């Protein structure tokens, strides 16, 4: 199994396949950013907490890593009915990232390789491998694509735009083109990150502490 990408989805896919006995190759454009929490250091939350719990129930690593690196745990939406309650944990970003990388590195059936996948290798409507931007080919019976925001990634800062998967990293434009050539239709979703506040510009004495929950 080849897994393209090493974010939340890529890690869970790689570990699940490896723990089921498959030989897994995880390909990441930068092996030092495996499990990186790019913007919000939260696991769970509204419309996401149930998914994090389902992953945990199926033996995933996300919940365990959150327990080990969490800073604050809360149940959101408790003013409403139990059907819309949502668990959320705020994590130590670097501790979460480093622990996830450590977990992946020690998994027996999982090999980690650095490289940007630029092309799907396929014939007769069947994928049989990938090719990197350096021209290296890897072959497998199954290819799982977990590229997150990197496919044709476009970043907006104010009125300015630039191509990129996230700050400081290039977009995966080659793989996007390869998917289109294979007959797959690509769409675009957009997410926004609010401006951060300068701590010394805030009068902290006027704020109310919001503690976590047991």
What are the residue ranges of the model-derived segments?
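Local beta-strand N-terminus motif with an aromatic residue
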Residues: 110, 127, 140-141
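Core beta-strand elements of the Rossmann-like FAD/NAD(P) dinucleotide-binding domain
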Residues: 133-142
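Beta1/beta-strand and adjacent pyrophosphate-binding region of the FAD-binding site
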Residues: 1-9
């Amino acid at each position: 199994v080849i897994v393209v990408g090493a974010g939340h989805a890529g890690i869970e896919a790689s570990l699940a396949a490896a723990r089921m006995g498959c030989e897994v190759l995880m390909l990441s454009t930068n092996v030092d950013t495996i499990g990186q929490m790019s913007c919000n250091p939260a696991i769970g939350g509204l419309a996401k907490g149930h998914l994090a719990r389902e992953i945990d129930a199926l033996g995933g690593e996300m919940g365990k890593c959150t327990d080990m690196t969490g800073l604050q745990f809360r149940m959101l939406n408790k003013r409403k009915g139990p059907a819309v309650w949502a668990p959320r944990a705020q994590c130590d970003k670097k501790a979460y990232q480093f622990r996830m990388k450590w977990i992946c590195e020690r998994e027996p059936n999982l090999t980690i390789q650095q490289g940007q996948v630029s092309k799907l290798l396929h014939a007769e409507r069947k994928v049989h491998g990938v090719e990197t931007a350096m021209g290296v080919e890897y072959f497998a019976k199954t290819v799982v694509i977990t590229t997150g925001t990197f496919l044709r990634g476009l970043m907006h800062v104010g009125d300015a735009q630039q191509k990129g998967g996230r700050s400081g990293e290039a977009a995966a434009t080659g793989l996007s083109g390869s998917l289109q050539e294979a007959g797959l239709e690509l769409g675009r979703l957009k997410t926004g990150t609010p401006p951060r506040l300068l701590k010394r510009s805030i009068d902290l004495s006027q704020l109310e502490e919001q503690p976590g929950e047991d």
